[in-house]
């Protein structure tokens, strides 16, 4: 029998050996038994409670501990250029850590907040030029940049918390563009086969079609990237597909607003920046959820098979995102309240 190091533990959920000694299993992300607990604030308790309910419905066991205070502790601190470069120095043979060298610390992303600020300021500057100088040349830039305000920072968030550091930025960009477009092609093709109307059932069908489009595109990349089998990899790949879907869709809706007969500058700003902000917890989050579900099923079966998409956690997470998507499209509560609830659930 092999001798384990003193810090080695077996994950209580996936039963894989945690050779890193980290608080959370590098294989499935579950909390290790006997790990020290950090204090969390009231907001963390609320979000953890919601997460526990969803975790139970989707087949998870045990409590879900979210250390929100630690997770965002680096956001408002000053960081050096070297720290920025280190974030993106990953994914190659020389920069991907070995399993035993994967960070033991709880992820503390921060650059995603800088991306959010950069995109928001850029959108406001483009809008300022549009209104002040009546310059319509900036409209395409405003449409595209504002459509990225919500989805792209969350994609960078997933990139930063990908503790295996085995996916480089260029791969993420490729998945964002081609994965997003592939999911749209699949979605539009399915809409030709299953046309929808304004009925409640049609709203559910439309949500299901879009979620299927994203999970198929995500799974295509997962089976292509055969050595990317960590749970965080599924979050990142699915999030990249969802971000691409969201940006292209949001740009389209903003363009529709621009073509409206009663168009005003204020309405255009509301549609462009408002729609972009809601991307924080829309397709990018739903894509990440289903991507994680596919990876969880794949961990159990090892070999990729398209039939696995419709089993276990993958199917349960697909149903969950379809329900969230349907709720998103169905005006039941005041708009801001409803979107706020969905943002909390998705995050």
Question: Which residues does each PLM region occupy?
Answer:
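Short, intrinsically disordered, charge-biased short linear motifs at domain edges
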Residues: 1-2, 11-16
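Residues immediately within or flanking Cys/His clusters that coordinate Zn2+
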Residues: 8, 22
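Cys/His-rich microdomains that often coordinate metals
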Residues: 4, 18, 32
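N-terminal acidic, proline/glycine-rich, low-complexity intrinsically disordered segments
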Residues: 1-4, 25
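Hydrophobic alpha-helical segments at protein termini of multi-pass membrane proteins
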Residues: 13, 24-347
